[in-house]
């Protein structure tokens, strides 16, 4: 059994969504945690739970961030967590239950394990995992949109994300 200690200082969770049919808006969640258990040498034994604090959303625009925290989007006054709980893990895919605004759907995402390295600063063993995917926000009750005069809508329904998580590990 491998002990995993999440290193939030060397981890990130970033997303992007199509805006006004012509560009992308990017942002991040600044507060999240990932708990992992299992044997790093046997991916089938790995189980993980990611917890994201949606009120930590950061798009570098305070007015937009406040709107994203409102009931039009994440409703952070009522829903203070987003969770992803794995069901299965392989070297290239992770399947699990994603819960946003109290709505749970099974999702499959791409995963990249980056091996094990020794941290020269403290001698600890570390590993990194990158998870990427696309989520249809409307499946989670995040339906806010506005029609454009030129056709189309203000926001895309698909949100692309990349989560990069680093862990100190020990046996």
UniProtKB/Swiss-Prot annotation:
Highest rank taxon of the organism: Bacteria
Pfam families per record: YceI
GO cellular component, as recorded: extracellular space
Disulfide partners: none
PANTHER family: PROTEIN YCEI
Family of this protein: Belongs to the UPF0312 family.
Protein name stated in the entry: UPF0312 protein SAOUHSC_03022
Taxonomic source organism: Staphylococcus aureus (strain NCTC 8325 / PS 47)
């Amino acid at each position: 059994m491998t002990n995993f200690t999440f290193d939030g200082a060397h981890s990130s969770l970033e997303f992007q969504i199509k805006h006004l049919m012509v560009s992308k808006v990017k942002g991040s969640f600044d507060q999240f945690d990932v708990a992992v258990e299992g044997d790093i040498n046997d991916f089938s034994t790995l189980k993980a739970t990611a917890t994201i604090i949606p009120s930590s959303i950061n798009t570098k625009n305070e007015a937009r961030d406040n709107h994203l925290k409102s009931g039009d989007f994440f409703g952070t006054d009522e829903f203070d967590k987003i969770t992803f709980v794995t069901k299965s893990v392989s070297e290239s895919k992770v399947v699990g239950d994603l819960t946003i605004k109290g709505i749970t759907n099974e999702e499959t995402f791409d995963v990249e394990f980056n091996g094990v390295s020794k941290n020269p600063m403290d001698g600890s063993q570390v590993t990194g995992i990158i998870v990427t995917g696309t989520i249809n926000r409307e499946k989670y009750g995040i339906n806010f949109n506005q029609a454009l005069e030129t056709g189309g809508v203000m926001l895309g329904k698909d949100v692309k994300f990349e989560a990069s998580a680093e862990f100190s590990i020990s046996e």
